[in-house]
Amino acid sequence: MQADTIKQEIRRLLKERNAVLLAHNYMRDEVQEIADITGDSLGLSQEAAKTAADVIVFCGVHFMAESASILSPHKTVLLPRRDAGCPMADMVTVEGLLELKARHPGVPVVTYVNSSAAVKAVSDICCTSANAVKVVNSLPDREVIFVPDRNLGQFVAKQSDKAFHFWDGYCPTHERLKADVVARLKAENPDALFICHPECNPAVVALADHACSTSGMYDYCRKSPAKRFIIGTEAGILYKLRLENPDKEFILASPALVCPNMKLTSLEDILDALTTMAPVVQVPEDIRVQAKRALDRMIAIPRD
């Protein structure tokens, strides 16, 4: 089947199923192109909860579909590729986190949304890369346990006076970007600003003109008078950056910045999911209620 035919059939089935198609910023270009809404993981889940759709087709990875299920328990959540996981989310287990909590009794657990529903359920509050500093600094406690991303945790710690206990997790894709590669690119492109995600190694973040979430990158690059940018996050972000800023140049900091899990989902997978109404992601109610509490505490923190 031709790509255009597949897209037409996807649109037809979305209407027939009263479904909304969500695509994360790191998805393949053609998936972002056909999506009803693109964005970061939590933002997409929140948008989906607001819609009148009965079905959410989440083009992302497993923990993202779980978040959609947590916030929209009465909607059917489809994850076109059941095998689309997140290595960083898999690095932290409930058992391991409970052991860490036992070693630091009374210390609140701040959990990055890039984590499983089960881990969120034994956490005190969640955070995103966009609001992590604000979430941590909103807590009255002098110490925090931060899971699972040590790189984001260190980025936050530099902007907080609290003591941190880090889980030793990381994003393999962002970790592949090395400081020497960035330094060389910056030297070769002195007029370009280097923008990176705080999931990058601290040595890379130290070289950045600006470090922020994916949604922050769109905003920063749109408003900046600069015309050239070196981008230090997953390659999928380039699609929308170039679409929104046709007069600007975006250079991917490394060809290694490709997440294999984010690239699994194809148009054919989306069509199959809508045709068969599977695979469904549904978080068990006891875990859902506890995980939602941690998400709700984060959402309750006022935005700037």
UniProtKB/Swiss-Prot annotation:
Q: E.C. number, please?
A: 2.5.1.72
Going by the entry's taxonomy, the superkingdom of the source organism is recorded as Bacteria
What catalytic activity does the UniProt entry give for this protein?
Answer: iminosuccinate + dihydroxyacetone phosphate = quinolinate + phosphate + 2 H2O + H(+)
Which amino acids does the record list as binding [4Fe-4S] cluster? C86, C171, C259
Residues that bind iminosuccinate, according to the entry?
A: H24, S41, Y112, V113, N114, S129, H197, P198, E199, T214
Query: Under which pathway is this protein filed?
Result: Cofactor biosynthesis; NAD(+) biosynthesis; quinolinate from iminoaspartate: step 1/1
Q: Where in the cell is it found?
A: Cytoplasm
Tell me its cofactors.
Answer: [4Fe-4S] cluster
Give the co-factor note: Binds 1 [4Fe-4S] cluster per subunit.
Biological process GO annotation list?
'de novo' NAD biosynthetic process from L-aspartate
**One GO cellular component term noted in the UniProt record for this chain:** cytosol
Molecular function GO terms recorded: 4 iron, 4 sulfur cluster binding; metal ion binding; quinolinate synthetase A activity
Which keywords does this chain's UniProt record carry? Answer: 4Fe-4S, Cytoplasm, Iron, Iron-sulfur, Metal-binding, Pyridine nucleotide biosynthesis, Transferase
InterPro entries reported for this sequence: NadA, NadA_sf, Quinolinate_synth_type2
The family classification in the record reads:
Belongs to the quinolinate synthase family. Type 2 subfamily.
PANTHER family assigned to the protein according to its UniProt record, in alphabetical order: QUINOLINATE SYNTHASE, CHLOROPLASTIC (PTHR30573:SF0), QUINOLINATE SYNTHETASE A (PTHR30573)
What does this protein do, in the record's words?
Answer: Catalyzes the condensation of iminoaspartate with dihydroxyacetone phosphate to form quinolinate.
**Protein's UniProt name:** Quinolinate synthase
